[in-house]
Amino acid sequence: MIRRQKYGDEIAKAQVLIEALPYIKKFSGKTVVIKYGGSAMLDCNLKRMVMQDIVLMKFVGLNPIVVHGGGPEINKMLERLGIESKFVNGLRVTDEATMEIVEMVLTGRINKEIVSLINELGGQAIGVSGKDGRLLKAEKDTSNGDIGYVGKIVDVNIDVITMMLEKGYIPVIAPTSFGDDGKTYNVNADTAAGKIAEALKAEKLILLTDVEGILSNINDKSSLISRMDLEHAKEFMNSGRINGGMIPKLECCIKAVENGVKRAHIIDGRLTHSLLLEIFTDEGIGTMIGKECFDDDNL
């Protein structure tokens, strides 16, 4: 009894590792696409913890791919330059001046910061944009009217990503994309992550957000829906109970699962080590979406 009390903390840590074991075994060698954004990009401690999670995932045999946004940083830069930020259904209205700022912030600052932090923590990351190696081909998105240089992805060059994964690197992707018209397009990072996950037939697509997940009542944080099948997700999407930035998130999760991704997750990136909690624990922390009902596991 004395020894159990003395080593209580160590035993608890061992139990955590034991709980994670079946998940590590199941997901070894599998690809996980992570959309990194929201408050987890602004808080230095959270930023470091997210990257620690990603490096750990790599070390235990998963193949993480990071697709990042940068909305708050872009907003700050636009405000500094006196340019107003406008959104339609969660998508940024992007004129030529805004597109220049978006590309500068995403590829020139945020992408390199993420790569540097992963490398500092012992991983090996390579940062690219959707324009590099013709990774993400886009065309003008007019589904919400003309909102400028906003693109929808029409092709993903998976050879570029596969090459990095095979060499042991963690790809870090900024979602600025190229068009056959020679123009650069701003693609919503959630949508880009979903398209990349679809193209790779990834095991998981995980979107880090600033909410607990999908709530049945947006005013009640305890109303988290932990699991949804496709039918439920589509019904919820069409119910009008979500708005703003959650629209493209749920939409891309639905499309990803329809097109070969096994599970899509919307989780709270404000929580410490949220990625590890969602992937390697029995309960998970956010909303998981799959093709059919799941009864007894988080796999």
Curated annotation (Swiss-Prot):
Q: What does this protein do?
A: Catalyzes the ATP-dependent phosphorylation of N-acetyl-L-glutamate.
In chain numbering, the residues marked as site (Transition state stabilizer) are K35, K249
- GO biological process entries: arginine biosynthetic process via ornithine; L-arginine biosynthetic process
**GO CC, alphabetical:** cytoplasm
Localization per Swiss-Prot or TrEMBL: Cytoplasm
User: Which Pfam families does the protein's record reference?
Assistant: AA_kinase
The residues listed in the UniProt record as binding substrate, with positions renumbered to this chain, are G70, G71, R92, N186
Q: Which UniProt keywords apply?
A: Amino-acid biosynthesis, Arginine biosynthesis, ATP-binding, Cytoplasm, Kinase, Nucleotide-binding, Transferase
Q: Which GO terms describe its molecular function?
A: acetylglutamate kinase activity; ATP binding
Q: What is its EC number?
A: 2.7.2.8
Q: In which pathway does it act?
A: Amino-acid biosynthesis; L-arginine biosynthesis; N(2)-acetyl-L-ornithine from L-glutamate: step 2/4
Q: Which family does it belong to?
A: Belongs to the acetylglutamate kinase family. ArgB subfamily.
Q: What's the protein called, per UniProt?
A: Acetylglutamate kinase
Catalysed reactions, semicolon-separated: N-acetyl-L-glutamate + ATP = N-acetyl-L-glutamyl 5-phosphate + ADP
